[in-house]
């Protein structure tokens, strides 16, 4: 959504990322991707193309990938208001946690768009198991390697360059410890 509205900032304008994010969050037709304000922003600060070949994410939840009420850090203005992937994205992949029970970590399931290659796949584990933030079990495995290997394979099969060590070092184990 952010790239569809604001484009991909040119390197000298990278410092404007917060301004771009604020623009993206504003309601109204002028701030929509084809609105006049968005067009002017992209023309001034961004590369001409907004095309994105592949988006791969792990367990997007709540508001823009973070829980809305987690420790009271977020408010309604940060809620994710559009669960459709932008028309500028060709391929979208989403690894989701099937064993998460906390309401703050409920996945934001994307709504499909016509003519888009989209896959959303459930993996064993809670939110942090999917993205990988826990130490390995005694057998040196973690649940996050399951979703990592899937995402690496998806990206590679769509002609993205993948660092070889990601596949070589992954040790997928669907029976690794669930931390919830």
Report residues per predicted region.
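Active-site- or binding-pocket-proximal scaffold segments within functional domains
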Residues: 1-180
